[in-house]
């Protein structure tokens, strides 16, 4: 699960304008990074333009998924990730960054034209959400629940195995008890015929 970029765009008034972006292309070779970065910026703008206000959508392109949330207030957020990244976490991140961006940068700052704004929190969110299980409480609880369930299954299996071993031990004890009674009876018979006077 990997996040490649997080972008905030101005959707209204058109044309779409990239306000700020953060990307992590370290998983690509040095020579591929610039072309992949350009591709992601181009595709981010294209997907944002084609998403209606108030809607969310996911667009797959090659090995990437672009998660888009175009809000009714003129802001649009786009996340580029791999196909394994969970949808719920992606949209949680989009809501969070768009709300925080709007709080720190009122509409008057970005609605009037081609501006690029500084929003260093994007880099923080990009690194924090690389591991969605650590960033998302529900996923973290689900992971802990799965781990607990695995431990519980192993414990139950070992208890059942011990129970089977106890059953075997009881059976052997019964067999030994039966054999010792038979030995006692045969020894008593043999001793009864050989009385020394």
Curated annotation (Swiss-Prot):
GO annotation, biological process: endoplasmic reticulum to Golgi vesicle-mediated transport; intracellular protein transport
Domain Longin, chain residue ranges per copy: 7-126
Gene Ontology molecular-function annotations: SNAP receptor activity
Pfam families documented for this protein: Longin, Synaptobrevin
UniProt keyword annotations, A-Z: Cell membrane, Coiled coil, Lipoprotein, Membrane, Methylation, Palmitate, Prenylation
A single cellular component GO annotation: plasma membrane
Localization, UniProt: Cell membrane
Record propeptide residues: 195-197
Residue list for modification Cysteine methyl ester: 194
Membrane topology: Lipid-anchor
Annotated lipid attachment (S-farnesyl cysteine): 194
Residues covalently joined to lipid (S-palmitoyl cysteine): 193
Protein species of origin: Schizosaccharomyces pombe (strain 972 / ATCC 24843)
Source organism, top-level taxon: Eukaryota
Residue intervals of the v-SNARE coiled-coil homology domain: 137-197
PROSITE patterns in UniProt: LONGIN, SYNAPTOBREVIN, V_SNARE
Protein's name according to its UniProt entry: Synaptobrevin homolog ykt6
SUPFAM superfamilies (alphabetical): SNARE fusion complex, SNARE-like
Family to which this protein belongs: Belongs to the synaptobrevin family.
Organism taxonomic ancestry: Eukaryota, Fungi, Dikarya, Ascomycota, Taphrinomycotina
Name of the gene encoding the protein in the UniProt record: ykt6
